[in-house]
Amino acid sequence: MAIRNLKPTSPGCRFQTISDFKEITCSSPEKSLTYGLCKKAGRNNHGHITSRRRGGGAKRLYRLIDFKRDKVGVPAKVAQIEYDPNRTARIALLHYVDGEKRYILAPVGIKQGDIIETGVDADIKPGNSLPMLHIPIGTLIHNIELNPGRGGQLCRSAGAYAQLVAREGKYALLRMPSGEVRKVLASGAATVGQVGNIHHENISLGKAGRNRWLGRRPKVRGVAMNPVDHPLGGGEGRSSGGRHPVSPWGMPTKGYKTRDKKKPSSRLIVKRRGQK
């Protein structure tokens, strides 16, 4: 993937950059692996907003992604690399030798015609999935299971990867993208390689409308609201808010620690992010 600059034919195009999509090999998804996606607009089942600044955006079909990679011992061929509007990564359509089709996250270096395998006997090459017990120390991995058999939950966005740095008993030690070093069960599966579309972080949207296409609505500052809506709201004319920055519910922001000190997973974190 490379990034393409647009000609400055309008203010919105002047600083806008887009992907050249050269890695994409088809224009329509596999129909049997898609279904319609209903707009949630940040609401829960009661209709209350639980995720602010969501709504609108282009229509999407959801692609069913195989995060579990449980088809052990059956090789598959990469039929095509596709765009997925529901995630930053690209996806790869696999045709298994028994006739089944599945989508997986497309890692760096994968291409049409490659053979992908799952299981303890799989080679250490991008796209192959196997338990971390059988992955060499130092390997870059993604789509990592926290609970064996539940499916990959870590390192799934564009360019993401963790590094397997050690094994201690039943645990594997991973260096996460944040710099945190944590333990996960080594019997859990992971996929070899780094998630593709690595230049996604360098894309400039260029204009507000492009955010709206993605279903993102404007973010209103607390000091611009009324006192009923935010602790920093109100005042005659422009004001500083009169207190340290807080969320709409009064929780301090700007570095305030919100993690529960008694959280069970804390014992699995060997080194916090940001620590030297």
From Swiss-Prot:
Chain's role: One of the primary rRNA binding proteins. Required for association of the 30S and 50S subunits to form the 70S ribosome, for tRNA binding and peptide bond formation. It has been suggested to have peptidyltransferase activity; this is somewhat controversial. Makes several contacts with the 16S rRNA in the 70S ribosome.
Homology family: Belongs to the universal ribosomal protein uL2 family.
InterPro entries reported in the protein's UniProt record: NA-bd_OB-fold (IPR012340), Rib_uL2_dom2 (IPR014722), Ribosomal_uL2 (IPR002171), Ribosomal_uL2_bac/org-type (IPR005880), Ribosomal_uL2_C (IPR022669), Ribosomal_uL2_CS (IPR022671), Ribosomal_uL2_dom3 (IPR014726), Ribosomal_uL2_RNA-bd_dom (IPR022666)
Chain intervals with Basic residues compositional bias: 259-276
Keyword list, A-Z: Ribonucleoprotein, Ribosomal protein, RNA-binding, rRNA-binding
Top-level taxon: Bacteria
Region (Disordered): 223-276
Assigned GO CC terms: large ribosomal subunit
Name recorded for this polypeptide: Large ribosomal subunit protein uL2
GO biological process: cytoplasmic translation
Description of how the protein assembles with itself and partners: Part of the 50S ribosomal subunit. Forms a bridge to the 30S subunit in the 70S ribosome.
Gene (UniProt): rplB
Molecular function GO labels: rRNA binding; structural constituent of ribosome; transferase activity
